[in-house]
Amino acid sequence: MKVISSIQELRDQLRGQNRTAFVPTMGNLHEGHLSLMRLARQHGDPVVASIFVNRLQFGPNEDFDKYPRTLQDDIEKLQNENVYVLFAPTERDMYPEPQEYRVLPPDDLGGILEGEFRPGFFAGVCTVVTKLMSCVQPRVAVFGKKDYQQLMIVRRMCQQLALPVEIIAAETVRDEDGLALSSRNRYLTADERTEAPELVKTLQRVRESVLGGERDLGKLEQHARAHLAERGWAPDYIAIRRRANLIAPSAAELEAGEPLVVLAAAKLGATRLIDNLEI
């Protein structure tokens, strides 16, 4: 595996490749990330991964400076997955001058849910993903369903900007107790780690209620938030939305069996966790 930090060197290395599969990451890789590499290999060759902790998507009170950086361990894991190139640019490589041009998602998709609680986050994501795709020029790119809203925004962005990249969705990888794998799980204390699976259990109960015929979605969302709050969580949102556009479904759409997803974000201690389940 070649480890490259220069954009020009990356382009030189990939010149002539027309089936490249790309997996962008921020590093601190776990089994969830590695599953993305394996899925990428099913859809293209060679597989290119990137590791870049993107300052643009962190808010002023978020964890950019303490976000775990484990490059040497990550390199070993990617080598074991037979990744062809790891693109690991420095901040100077990616942003040699202030990044004044940004890619802004529409408010109806980028300003809700995560966008409401993390203003500027999706503009940072869209900007860096567009720039990375310009560097790699892949045929396909793999994103995880764990970041459901991000997946939808990136897919829509590629459609709207006519980027010739197919976005592949990867299923969420979970620990045995159901907790979705995340680089931020390492922030949890032992007691918090024991409690953390309650988030997905809460979403499972919401899903079961909807599938069982409950149509008062607002009541379900409120009860789920209250349940987590009683257990010491600080929920930002629990929302049942249409999979197609993350808009709340109408009564007619519910009766017609509209595909739904329930999404959640909540703090447990100092750690903010997100998760979702399709319904």
Curated annotation (Swiss-Prot):
Indicate the residues that form the catalytic site.
Answer: H33
Q: Which UniProt keywords apply?
A: ATP-binding, Cytoplasm, Ligase, Nucleotide-binding, Pantothenate biosynthesis
* Main location (coarse class): cytoplasm
Catalysed reactions, semicolon-separated: (R)-pantoate + beta-alanine + ATP = (R)-pantothenate + AMP + diphosphate + H(+)
The record's annotation in InterPro entries points to: Cyt_trans-like, Pantoate_ligase, Pantoate_ligase_C, Rossmann-like_a/b/a_fold
Report the EC code(s) recorded for this entry. Answer: 6.3.2.1
Q: Which residues bind beta-alanine?
A: Q57
Q: Where does this protein hold (R)-pantoate?
A: Q57, Q150
**Origin: domain of life:** Bacteria
Q: Name one GO biological process term.
A: pantothenate biosynthetic process
Q: Which Pfam families does the protein's record reference?
A: Pantoate_ligase (PF02569)
Q: In which pathway does it act?
A: Cofactor biosynthesis; (R)-pantothenate biosynthesis; (R)-pantothenate from (R)-pantoate and beta-alanine: step 1/1
Q: Which positions does UniProt annotate for ATP binding? A: 26-33, 144-147, 173, 181-184
One Gene Ontology MF term: pantoate-beta-alanine ligase activity
A single GO CC term for this protein reads:
cytosol
Q: Which cysteines are joined by disulfide bonds?
A: none
Identify the enzyme class.
Answer: ligase
Subcellular location per UniProt equals: Cytoplasm
Q: What else is known?
A: The reaction proceeds by a bi uni uni bi ping pong mechanism.
Assembly description: Homodimer.
Role noted for this protein? Catalyzes the condensation of pantoate with beta-alanine in an ATP-dependent reaction via a pantoyl-adenylate intermediate.
Family membership, please give it: Belongs to the pantothenate synthetase family.
Per its record, how is this protein called by name? Pantothenate synthetase
Recorded source organism is: Burkholderia vietnamiensis (strain G4 / LMG 22486)
* Lineage, opening ranks: Bacteria, Pseudomonadati, Pseudomonadota, Betaproteobacteria, Burkholderiales
